UniProtKB/Swiss-Prot annotation:
Residues 30-43 form the CRIB domain. One of its GO terms (cellular component) is plasma membrane. This is CDC42 small effector protein 1. It comes from Gallus gallus. Its main location: cytoplasm. It is a lipid-anchor. GO terms for biological process: regulation of cell shape; regulation of Rho protein signal transduction. The lineage of its organism: Eukaryota, Metazoa, Chordata, Craniata, Vertebrata. GO terms for molecular function: small GTPase binding. Probably involved in the organization of the actin cytoskeleton by acting downstream of CDC42, inducing actin filament assembly. Pfam families: PBD (PF00786).
């Protein structure tokens, strides 16, 4: 009898789970910001010609608040 179960087990192959597609997000699913804290303001007068946005001050403020670490580039164009 155990020989029967051994042979049966060799024929049964577990199928891999199909990958679930992520639901596409549209504007109607996005609500108002929650727990928003305004850290700094960057206005048109804060932009240096040819250097992009001076982000070092804002990045330091955001890092002091905690959260995800992200590398910011001063040459990034918004």
């Amino acid at each position: 009898m155990s020989d029967f179960w051994h042979k049966l087990g060799c024929c049964v192959v577990e199928k891999p789970q199909p990958k679930k597609r992520r639901r596409r997000i549209d504007r109607s699913m996005i609500g108002e910001p929650m727990n928003f804290v305004h850290l700094t303001h960057i206005g048109s007068g804060d932009m240096a010609a040819g250097e992009g946005l001076p982000m070092t001050g804002a990045v330091q403020e955001m890092r002091s608040k905690g959260g995800r670490e992200r590398q910011w580039s001063s040459s990034r164009v918004l």
